[in-house]
Design a protein with these regions (language model features):
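N-terminal alpha-helical "arm" segments
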Residues: 1-44, 338-351
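Short alpha-helical segments and helix-capping/turn motifs at coil-helix boundaries
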Residues: 28-31, 184-188, 313-315
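Assembly/oligomerization interface modules of large self-assembling protein complexes
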Residues: 34-102
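A short, structural micro-pattern
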Residues: 37-39, 195, 323
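Long, contiguous amphipathic alpha-helices that act as assembly "spine/axial" helices in icosahedral shell
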Residues: 84-158, 178, 182, 188-209, ...
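Structured, charged N-terminal subsegments at the starts of enzyme catalytic cores
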Residues: 151-171
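Acidic/histidine-enriched, beta-strand-rich ligand/metal-binding domains
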Residues: 171-201, 206, 212-214, 218-221, ...
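Sequence/fold signature of self-assembling virion shell proteins
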Residues: 218-351
């Protein structure tokens, strides 16, 4: 007789989590594609700083000259823990599920399987939204505020490639400004300091409107100047709109309309906020070095009460409590988005 496998065994829950459809996220999937998991709660991050040193001339009688190694800086971070959980009660298993037929013959055990899959899907989507928010905060502020129950700190990457246009006549809302010249200047700054060519520009909604409607931009986008730039708005998934391309720079321009629910700044008045500040833009390179790191998760085995440390992106766990009877489903993750070269992108506030 075959042994029965509980749906709440870690290996079974792990397979459920792995089979769930992913949530598409623009920043995370476009830039922070490299993933690495660790067996420790702390991770070491190497930050490299290159140079444009030229090979030295030497006399044929002297021979070679030693060139110093390019240095790097290692910092240790503790990836923040995110651990949303759901509760299943007896009522959840005995009553009809949303969308279930009034005359359904499903058993409580069958409903338990469906609810577990739905719960893990919801929990993983919440974690992925958190990862996307962390990526956006890293890009636009160079820091990740860690605010939650029992935690209030900031992970700061010492980002300095940013500029706010404060002079009224130079703001993109003024006809006297020159958005194309500004973008060229910021693009060159990243080339000089970050050693990469920015190929994507992500604009907030207000910046995108000011850019597209600016007379100098529209003049440049005249049909006769097709080789310089083109505007061809096109809707893409998950709030991303392709605006056009500045061919001269090889720079694709996007508007990213995506929001998240901020229910921790003021818990009494949760607010939907944009991932991309409406008055900001970022110039980025898909060839720059970004990573998603995941610290280890430590759980307690319900069978014997011993601690166990698990390496993985998303670690499921479950336990029960009595009076009233409840089962808890938890999905834990310790993500950290890492920009290995903080000079490889530029952020501006042009309006």
């Amino acid at each position: 007789m075959a042994n029965e496998v509980s749906i709440y065994e870690p290996r079974t829950m792990g397979r459920v989590v792995q089979k769930l459809p992913p949530v598409r996220t623009f920043f995370r999937s476009t830039f922070f594609r490299h993933e690495e998991t660790f067996t420790t709660k702390d991770v070491d991050v190497d930050f490299r700083k290159g140079s444009r040193k030229v090979a030295p001339f030497v006399s044929r009688l002297v021979g070679g000259k030693v060139v110093p190694n390019t240095g790097y800086q290692t910092k240790t971070y503790t990836p923040p823990l995110v651990a949303p959980e759901k509760v299943t009660t007896v009522d959840d298993l005995l009553i009809r599920r949303p969308g279930e037929s009034l005359y359904s013959g499903r058993t409580p055990a069958e409903r338990a399987v469906l609810k577990m899959a739905d719960d893990f899907k919801e929990l993983r989507e919440q974690i992925l939204r958190r990862e996307e928010l962390m990526c956006a905060q890293t890009i636009f502020t160079g820091a990740i505020p860690i605010i939650g129950d029992g935690v209030n700190e900031v992970i700061d990457f010492s980002f300095t490639n940013k500029e706010t246009i404060s002079v009224a006549k130079n703001k993109w809302t003024a006809d006297t400004s020159d958005p194309i010249a500004d973008i060229k200047r910021w693009h060159e700054t990243v080339q000089k300091k970050g050693f990469v060519n920015c190929d994507i520009c992500v604009m907030g909604s207000d910046v995108a409107n000011a850019f597209v409607n600016h007379p100098k931009v529209q003049k440049m986008l005249d049909v006769k100047n097709f080789n310089l730039a083109v505007i061809q708005p096109k809707q893409l998934p998950n709030g991303v709109t392709y605006i056009g391309t500045i061919h001269e720079l090889g720079l694709d321009i996007y508007k990213y309309n995506e929001w998240y629910l901020d229910d921790w700044t003021n818990p009494d008045a949760p607010e939907d906020k944009p991932l991309v500040p409406a008055n900001s833009l970022a110039l980025l390179s898909t060839n720059a070095d970004y990573s998603m790191y995941y610290g280890a998760i430590t759980l307690i085995k319900e069978q014997d009460g011993n601690f166990v440390t698990v390496e993985g992106k998303y670690v499921p766990d479950t336990w029960t409590k009595r009076k009233p009877a409840r089962r808890f489903l938890n999905l834990s993750s310790a993500p950290l988005c890492v920009p290995h070269d903080v000079d490889s992108w530029f952020v501006a506030t042009p309006i």
